[in-house]
Structure formats: structure tokens, C-alpha cells
Amino acid sequence: MEPKARCSDSQRGGPCTNHEPPALEEGGRRHRRARAGSSSGALGLQLRPRVRPQRRAAAAAAAAAAAAAAATAASAAASAILGGRAAAAQPIGHPDALERAARANLRARRGDAWRGRGAPQRRAPAEARALGAASRALARRGAAPAAPLRGQPGPALPPPGPEAEPALPGGGQLAVAGPAAPEAPGLGLGGGLDPVRPRGGGRTRGHPRGAGPGVRRGGLLGRGNLPHIGGGHIPLGLVFLVQPAAGGRALLLDQPAVAG
């Protein structure tokens, strides 16, 4: 009986890490990594299905067509709801537009962390800069009333007449943010604008026990839900579709062009 083939590891007295037991080998010299590449044992057949390029292209085309159809339906719904005003404006059909803006604001604040402890307070966030630009553009055109402070109601809107906008599907309501917004605590709209305040809190900012005075967690826009759009923490002239059936998420429908 011939001696079994032994590798260098087993000759030193350690376990054999490079070869399988001789009963499972072919001649005692087959490498373990050669068996690991085949998924069906000794046959070496690959059981993973290969993706056909035609099917991949067809799936991509179907996804693009579905996205285009959804965008068309959203723009048509916005035009029907706003009475054609969305056609001359800049529609934003993405339902998470508020959340994306809040995340961009958070990234801008985090980018200033290397400047020091008080840098996020000295530099205005992206929403505040956009709000200031919109207010100055409207003031140059003579169409911006004086923005009241927080807690003071904005100018009252006239009662709806017979030419009121039709009821929205799903029991939604239109909400216009800015100085002309009515007092609607049920919708989370406080009316008027809120001046930009320092966040405070220092290094523990963002923690529920470490937040200092004047802190609004989550940025100026919050996460896009109803409790976070109250008090006028959003730029002027934004039109939202508030859908209670969708968990109270506010859908940004219309953003007028305010650049002078």
C-alpha cells in the first residue's frame, strides 16, 4: 500500500489547509479552491442564470416608460388642481422634495463643522439664502407685503366663492405657504414667516436632552410632514397638496418663478 500524498502543512504536524481529505480528492492533489469555483460539485456546472442583454434593455425601457407616464400624470394632475397655473410655473413633482431639501440643508451644515463650534450659526443655511433671495426679488417687483413675525397672523384670505377649486382626490387640501397663508393650525400652517434664529446647543445639538434654545431639529424644513411645515419655515409661494390619507405628507406641487 502506497503512502498517501501529504502536503507541507500536514508534514509539519498541522492541519491540512490546502487540500481536502484523500477520500474526496482525485489523486490526492486537487486544490480546495478549484472545488469552490464550481457550484454543482465534480461536474463544474454554473447554476447561476446569465442575464440576457435583450431582457435587461427591455426592463430598462419599461422602467423609463413607467417613469415618463408617472411624470405626465403628476403634471396633468397639478395643472388640473391649480387651474393651469402650474403650466407657467416650475413644477416639482417629486413627493420627497421637502425631505431632499432638508437633507441638503443638513449636509451644508455638516460641511461647516471644520470651521469651529459656531460656524453653523454664522452661516445662513441654503433655505434661508433662498428665502432671502425670493423676498428681495418680490420686493423689487413691489409684490411682497411686509412679512409678519412668528405668532402674528398673516393677511386673511377672502372666503371661497362659487368659482372655488374642485375637491381633490383622497380628501386632500391645498396649502399655500408664505405671508398670505391663513391661520390653519389643523393643517400645521401658522401663517406668516419665521425669522431665522441661531440653532444653539453647541456640541450636543441634535440630541433631545442637549438641544439649546431656538433649536429646530431636522433643519428648517423638517422631514416634510405636516407638523414640520408649520410656522412658515418654508420659502414664499410654495403650493402643497396635503393628503391625510397618505400619512399627512405634504406634496410640493408648484413653485413660482420669483427671480427678478
Curated annotation (Swiss-Prot):
UniProt entry tagged with the keyword Lipoprotein: no
Region (Disordered), start-end ranges: 1-50, 108-219
Gene Ontology CC, one term: nucleolus
Biased composition (Gly residues): 187-199, 209-219
Keywords: Nucleus, Secreted
Region (Required for nucleolar localization): 104-130
Residues spanning the signal sequence: none
Modifications made to the protein after synthesis: Undergoes proteolytic cleavage to produce a secreted C-terminal fragment.
Low complexity compositional bias, start-end: 36-48, 116-154, 164-186
Subunit structure: Interacts with C1QBP; the interaction results in nucleolar localization of C1QBP, probably due to prevention of C1QBP maturation and redirection from mitochondria to nucleoli.
Protein name: POLG alternative reading frame
Gene behind the chain: POLGARF
